[in-house]
């Protein structure tokens, strides 16, 4: 008799709350779930696609120093402590996240890449992955944007003879030395990378519009106003603008130095790409060995496609952190909670609403599923 148990699909593991993603937003939600009395394992699980702690920060370019990164707010319950601001941001944040997971005994399973979330029996949501599946009473999706770099199309892009890369591919200025680099984009990454690259080689900056520069400090009131503007968009079902698009760009010493050497003399967007550069309809031409697309990212929400959440305008309508069309699902790290401080607040808010939802009469507390150990993760 042949034992074919290995080929049989595992039954879903019942869990109260499944958190998808272990970046700033996911860890914040996990912390507040523990504080709210959810037990690690049967109460909640965190499913992370990466092989180690750190979220998107693990993949930031090595030359990005912690002191030059967007302000990183500490996770709830554990200060960052004294940090060497000249250390690579990727290492500092990854070490901090690892310590955080250990300190609060968070049930993070990795690498687990969630491929789909879909309706299941008994008012559950089925969270699917190659490592197994979970039947959750509520889901917190905190998958961020790093895995979905946005590459805008311009005529001739496929015929460019040089190298094209995105912010997500950038590893440092040294590999670009001696080549003329056209940097495309008007956000924080574009300006940061221009400041680095223009110190070692020639550059041209191309962006649709001049960014809003911020010379002074960004206080708490300005932060609240910026978040409110992004929140208004998602409440109306529109795709969210990036938080930095409403906060403006800080003029750091490195940015000021780049400005002084002429690297921030912006050209409008080109009309097409030619094999040896970029061109405008008015006859202008700039040669290029490299085109660096600092054109941002989109929310990584493909795993939610089976739930049909999109509004006609392309966005997902939100009520706070809750998806209007699916009250068992919360999105954090999306829209107004895309910043580190926004993610912390969103984690607290999502857990509060989940606890209220699961306490309502008629919401089943258990499923007739065979209790099994969680799927093993290599």
Predicted features and spans:
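Glycine-rich flavin
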Residues: 64-85, 233-236
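Flavin (primarily FAD) cofactor-binding/catalytic cores of flavoenzymes
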Residues: 2-50, 55-56, 85-378
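Glycine-rich loop at the start of a catalytic domain that most often binds anionic cofactors/ligands
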Residues: 61
């Amino acid at each position: 008799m042949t034992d074919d148990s290995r080929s049989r699909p595992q039954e879903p593991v019942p869990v109260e709350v499944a958190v998808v993603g272990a970046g700033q937003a996911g860890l914040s939600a996990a912390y507040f779930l523990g504080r709210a009395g959810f037990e690690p394992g049967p109460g909640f699980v965190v499913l992370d696609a990466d092989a180690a702690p750190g979220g998107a920060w693990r993949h930031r370019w090595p030359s990005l120093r912690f002191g030059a990164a967007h302000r990183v707010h500490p996770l709830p319950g554990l200060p960052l402590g004294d940090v060497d601001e000249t250390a690579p941001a990727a290492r500092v944040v990854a070490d901090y996240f690892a310590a955080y997971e250990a300190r609060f005994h968070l049930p993070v399973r990795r690498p687990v890449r969630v491929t789909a979330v879909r309706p299941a029996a008994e008012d559950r949501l089925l969270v699917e992955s190659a490592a197994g599946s979970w039947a959750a009473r509520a889901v917190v999706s905190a998958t961020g944007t790093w895995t979905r770099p946005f590459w805008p199309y311009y005529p001739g892009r496929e015929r460019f003879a040089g190298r094209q890369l995105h912010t997500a591919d950038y590893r440092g200025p040294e590999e670009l030395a001696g080549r003329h680099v056209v940097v495309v984009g008007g956000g924080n990454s574009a300006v940061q990378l221009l400041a680095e690259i223009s110190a070692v080689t020639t550059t041209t900056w191309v962006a649709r519009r001049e960014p809003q520069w911020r010379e002074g400090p960004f206080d708490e009131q300005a932060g609240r106003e910026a978040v409110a503007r992004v929140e208004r968009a998602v409440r109306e079902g529109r795709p969210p603008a990036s938080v930095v698009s409403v906060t403006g760009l800080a003029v750091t010493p490195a940015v000021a130095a780049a400005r002084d050497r002429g690297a921030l003399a912006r050209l409008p967007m080109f009309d097409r790409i030619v094999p040896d550069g970029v061109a405008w309809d008015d006859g202008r031409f700039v040669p290029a060995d490299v085109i660096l697309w600092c054109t941002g990212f989109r929310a990584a929400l493909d795993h939610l496609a089976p739930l049909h959440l999109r509004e006609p305008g392309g966005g997902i309508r939100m009520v706070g952190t809750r998806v209007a069309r699916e009250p068992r699902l919360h999105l954090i790290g999306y829209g107004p909670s895309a910043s580190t401080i926004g993610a912390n607040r969103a984690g607290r808010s999502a857990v509060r609403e989940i606890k209220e939802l699961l306490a309502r009469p008629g919401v089943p507390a258990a499923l007739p599923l065979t209790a099994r150990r969680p799927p093993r993760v290599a």
